[in-house]
A protein has these predicted regions:
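Cytosolic juxtamembrane N-terminal segments of multi-pass membrane proteins
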Residues: 1-76
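Intrinsic-disorder/low-complexity coil detector
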Residues: 23, 37, 101-103, 181, ...
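Long amphipathic alpha-helices with heptad-repeat character
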Residues: 50-78, 126-169, 187, 204
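Transmembrane alpha-helical hairpins and terminal membrane-anchor modules
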Residues: 71-147
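Charged, low-complexity cytosol-facing tails and large interhelical loops of integral membrane proteins
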Residues: 141-256
Length: 256
């Protein structure tokens, strides 16, 4: 998402009453750009508990801090590296020329390397406490504090679809069952955004492989996926919910 397009954060209440937040923030430098977007809005189906919102806000603080560290490391990497390299050279020459007692070359290298690494770490720690970084930290935290959640009928429909997969004895059976579309009335860019954020939770090839097995109805696919999910501690109901939503959205695009 670019420009001033609204970024949504989705709060879904699960069948057991716990909460899940879907959002694009991952603690990388892109998070800084997203948090600086003037339009960030939270949407919920069932009303969230204060404790859930507080916990999520603290999570965003942590992600913003990680993003800020990545940003500072990239912005100041070159000058810190050059200064550390210069200290390495100076230390090596000092040990080689100035120190009277001969020091083995290997020891000179190790000592000089330790000095340069210590200098780099100290410079990085100092930079994270700089006025520039602190100003950006305050801006990000203030931005997080201004995010407001409002009720959404679309998110309510999505919650119902998630509950369908959680309430069944087996989430895979709920996915494969030929039933009415639980997302029939959930359309538009909000659903696409939810799907995008869910895909961030299931990003690697392992998930793609299991997805193909299920959607192609391969022999023994359901049992293989159950075993895989158990071994990898996968949130199977959420994964099946994601696949069902992905299949629904893809089908609509094909028939347009």
């Amino acid at each position: 998402m670019t420009g001033a397009e609204t970024i949504h954060i989705f709060h879904l209440v699960r069948h057991d009453g716990s909460a899940i937040f879907l959002h694009p923030f991952r603690g990388d430098q892109n998070t800084l750009d997203l948090l600086e977007n003037p339009q960030i809005e939270g949407l919920y189906g069932a009303e969230p508990q204060v404790a859930s919102l507080t916990g999520f806000r603290n999570e965003l603080y942590s992600l913003a801090e990680s993003a800020l560290r990545a940003w500072d490391s990239q912005m100041r990497f070159l000058p810190r590296f050059v200064l550390s390299a210069a200290l390495f050279v100076v230390s090596f020459l000092f040990l080689s020329i100035v120190v009277r007692d001969p020091v083995p070359v290997l020891d000179e290298l190790l000592i000089s390397l330790a000095v340069s690494i210590a200098a780099y770490v100290a410079l990085r720690a100092r930079g994270r406490g700089s006025e520039r970084v602190e100003r950006k930290r305050i801006t990000l935290r203030s931005r997080i504090d201004t995010i407001v959640f409002s009720e959404s009928s679309v998110v309510q429909l999505l919650e119902e679809g998630l509950h369908m997969h959680e309430a069944e004895q087996d989430a895979i059976d709920a996915l494969l069952a030929e039933r009415g579309d639980p997302f029939a009335e959930a359309e538009g860019p909000i659903v696409d955004e939810v799907l995008q954020y869910l895909s961030l939770r299931f990003p690697d090839r392992g998930f793609r492989r299991q997805e193909r097995r299920l959607l192609r109805a391969e022999r023994g696919a359901a049992e293989q996926v159950r075993h895989w999910a158990s071994q990898q501690s996968i949130d199977l109901p959420l994964f099946c919910f994601y696949l069902r939503l992905k299949r629904t959205v893809g089908s609509r695009k094909v028939h347009r």
